[in-house]
């Protein structure tokens, strides 16, 4: 058996990635989220495939085909809600995974980090297009509002929007192409995930201390396979609690009304995992400025390795940086709350303050505090 595992062309790739992989001996539960993201992706592809068997990408039948899946298909309701809430779990794990990377300085593995940012953008695009497919009110108006942002691009904006729509408004052509992209993108995500792992295994994983673990490695199996299974079990418990007890908790009631181009919902808002970026977008009165702030709010992750001024890699022994990190987390939670509120006083002012704080923390305060900590440690 050992010979097959280590010598077979396919098996030895699996062996070197998941079985005999040398892993740091001290990585904590914050390192579980990579495998949980893999599990979420697998779940999304499987449930998505079964949904695609019954879904019709046509404006006249899309809404009723989703209702048909929930009412008439065997276990269709659970497949649909696993897929919808699976996206929420995916983003929850994704945000924690990125947060862990920021806290423990994993961004110094630049290739892995940059592919991770590309993955984040791809997953966000996939989730946005998936939200359009049920063709409810929020699907239609969400698609209209978000695609319309591209019209802020000078000179080519309007043409670009109409090109994406496939006409002069969000209609049948838009729905069909969104379904096509929503179907193909997860497989592109799988390819990017393999690249992400490839670059990670070139350098080896980081650890909570931020030091080299070359002198103290343990095999991935059985230690971390068992540890990942525990994380997976907890995720399944959380997921099934959500799906079986309150599947619509994170959804929008407006999406149970069929899309109507003549009736605008009072508050157009995306799913909860986009609200922080949506709040940043809305906090700038200028359209182009808002779009740039929206893009930069995520693209800012790419310059974090440049902004890293600390002599220590991890924040584990840097209490001042820890304070700023948790302030950033709180700020993102405030932005998420603001993104779901109507555009009126005092929410506009809170959103603007939180947006300014977000960029100030990352671009100015964190690098400054890192330099102060270097001085305090006489480094």
Curated annotation (Swiss-Prot):
<dbReference type="GO" id="GO:0008121">
    <property type="term" value="F:ubiquinol-cytochrome-c reductase activity"/>
</dbReference>
<feature type="transmembrane region" description="Helical">
    <location>
        <begin position="226"/>
        <end position="246"/>
    </location>
</feature>
<feature type="transmembrane region" description="Helical">
    <location>
        <begin position="320"/>
        <end position="340"/>
    </location>
</feature>
<dbReference type="InterPro" id="IPR048259">
    <property type="entry name" value="Cytochrome_b_N_euk/bac"/>
</dbReference>
<comment type="similarity">
    <text>Belongs to the cytochrome b family.</text>
</comment>
<feature type="binding site" description="axial binding residue">
    <location>
        <position position="97"/>
    </location>
    <ligand>
        <name>heme b b566</name>
    </ligand>
</feature>
<feature type="binding site">
    <location>
        <position position="201"/>
    </location>
    <ligand>
        <name>a ubiquinone</name>
    </ligand>
</feature>
<comment type="subunit">
    <text>The cytochrome bc1 complex contains 11 subunits: 3 respiratory subunits (MT-CYB, CYC1 and UQCRFS1), 2 core proteins (UQCRC1 and UQCRC2) and 6 low-molecular weight proteins (UQCRH/QCR6, UQCRB/QCR7, UQCRQ/QCR8, UQCR10/QCR9, UQCR11/QCR10 and a cleavage product of UQCRFS1). This cytochrome bc1 complex then forms a dimer.</text>
</comment>
<feature type="transmembrane region" description="Helical">
    <location>
        <begin position="77"/>
        <end position="98"/>
    </location>
</feature>
<feature type="transmembrane region" description="Helical">
    <location>
        <begin position="178"/>
        <end position="198"/>
    </location>
</feature>
<keyword id="KW-0479">Metal-binding</keyword>
<feature type="transmembrane region" description="Helical">
    <location>
        <begin position="113"/>
        <end position="133"/>
    </location>
</feature>
<keyword id="KW-0496">Mitochondrion</keyword>
<keyword id="KW-0349">Heme</keyword>
<dbReference type="InterPro" id="IPR027387">
    <property type="entry name" value="Cytb/b6-like_sf"/>
</dbReference>
<dbReference type="Pfam" id="PF00032">
    <property type="entry name" value="Cytochrom_B_C"/>
</dbReference>
<dbReference type="InterPro" id="IPR036150">
    <property type="entry name" value="Cyt_b/b6_C_sf"/>
</dbReference>
<keyword id="KW-0830">Ubiquinone</keyword>
<dbReference type="InterPro" id="IPR005797">
    <property type="entry name" value="Cyt_b/b6_N"/>
</dbReference>
<feature type="transmembrane region" description="Helical">
    <location>
        <begin position="347"/>
        <end position="367"/>
    </location>
</feature>
<keyword id="KW-0472">Membrane</keyword>
<dbReference type="InterPro" id="IPR005798">
    <property type="entry name" value="Cyt_b/b6_C"/>
</dbReference>
<dbReference type="GO" id="GO:0006122">
    <property type="term" value="P:mitochondrial electron transport, ubiquinol to cytochrome c"/>
</dbReference>
<keyword id="KW-0408">Iron</keyword>
<keyword id="KW-0813">Transport</keyword>
<keyword id="KW-1133">Transmembrane helix</keyword>
<dbReference type="GO" id="GO:0005743">
    <property type="term" value="C:mitochondrial inner membrane"/>
</dbReference>
<dbReference type="InterPro" id="IPR048260">
    <property type="entry name" value="Cytochrome_b_C_euk/bac"/>
</dbReference>
<keyword id="KW-0249">Electron transport</keyword>
<keyword id="KW-0999">Mitochondrion inner membrane</keyword>
<feature type="binding site" description="axial binding residue">
    <location>
        <position position="83"/>
    </location>
    <ligand>
        <name>heme b b562</name>
    </ligand>
</feature>
<dbReference type="GO" id="GO:0046872">
    <property type="term" value="F:metal ion binding"/>
</dbReference>
<dbReference type="GO" id="GO:0045275">
    <property type="term" value="C:respiratory chain complex III"/>
</dbReference>
<feature type="transmembrane region" description="Helical">
    <location>
        <begin position="33"/>
        <end position="53"/>
    </location>
</feature>
<keyword id="KW-0812">Transmembrane</keyword>
<feature type="transmembrane region" description="Helical">
    <location>
        <begin position="288"/>
        <end position="308"/>
    </location>
</feature>
<dbReference type="InterPro" id="IPR016174">
    <property type="entry name" value="Di-haem_cyt_TM"/>
</dbReference>
<dbReference type="InterPro" id="IPR030689">
    <property type="entry name" value="Cytochrome_b"/>
</dbReference>
<dbReference type="Pfam" id="PF00033">
    <property type="entry name" value="Cytochrome_B"/>
</dbReference>
<feature type="binding site" description="axial binding residue">
    <location>
        <position position="196"/>
    </location>
    <ligand>
        <name>heme b b566</name>
    </ligand>
</feature>
<protein>
    <recommendedName>
        <fullName>Cytochrome b</fullName>
    </recommendedName>
</protein>
<comment type="function">
    <text>Component of the ubiquinol-cytochrome c reductase complex (complex III or cytochrome b-c1 complex) that is part of the mitochondrial respiratory chain. The b-c1 complex mediates electron transfer from ubiquinol to cytochrome c. Contributes to the generation of a proton gradient across the mitochondrial membrane that is then used for ATP synthesis.</text>
</comment>
């Amino acid at each position: 058996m050992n010979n097959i595992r280590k010598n077979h062309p396919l098996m030895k790739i699996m062996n070197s990635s998941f079985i005999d992989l040398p892993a740091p001996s001290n990585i904590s539960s914050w390192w579980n989220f990579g495998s949980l993201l893999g599990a979420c992706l697998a779940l999304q592809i499987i449930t998505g495939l079964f949904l695609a068997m019954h879904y019709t990408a046509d404006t006249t039948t899309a809404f009723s085909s989703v209702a048909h899946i929930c009412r008439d298909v065997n276990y269709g309701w659970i497949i649909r809600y696993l897929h919808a809430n699976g996206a929420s779990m995916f983003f929850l794990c994704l945000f924690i995974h990125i947060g862990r990377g920021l806290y423990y300085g994993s961004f110094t593995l630049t290739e892995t980090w940059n592919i991770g940012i590309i993955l984040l953008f791809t997953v966000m695009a996939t989730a946005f297009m998936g939200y359009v497919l049920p063709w409810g009110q929020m699907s239609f108006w969400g698609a209209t509002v978000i695609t319309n942002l591209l019209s802020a691009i000078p000179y080519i904006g309007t043409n670009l929007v109409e090109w994406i729509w496939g006409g002069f408004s969000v209609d049948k052509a838009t729905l069909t192409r969104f379904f096509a992209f929503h179907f193909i993108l997860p497989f592109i995500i799988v390819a990017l995930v393999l690249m992400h792992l490839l670059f990670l295994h070139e350098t080896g994983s980081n650890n909570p201390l931020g030091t080299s673990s070359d002198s103290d490695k343990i095999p991935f199996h059985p230690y971390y396979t068992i540890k990942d299974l525990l994380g997976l079990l907890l995720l399944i418990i959380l997921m099934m609690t959500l799906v079986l007890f309150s599947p619509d908790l994170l959804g929008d009631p407006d999406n149970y009304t069929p899309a109507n181009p003549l009736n605008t919902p009072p508050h157009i808002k995306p799913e909860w995992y986009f609200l922080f970026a949506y709040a940043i977008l809305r906090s700038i009165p200028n359209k182009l400025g808002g779009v740039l702030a929206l893009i930069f709010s995520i693209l800012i992750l790419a310059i974090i390795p440049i902004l890293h001024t600390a002599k220590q890699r991890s924040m584990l022994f840097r209490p001042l940086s820890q304070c700023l990190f948790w302030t950033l987390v709180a700020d993102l939670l405030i932005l998420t709350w603001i993104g779901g509120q109507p555009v009126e006083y005092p929410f506009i002012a809170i959103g603007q303050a939180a947006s300014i704080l977000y960029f100030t923390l990352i671009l100015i305060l964190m690098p400054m505090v890192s330099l102060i900590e270097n001085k305090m440690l006489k480094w």
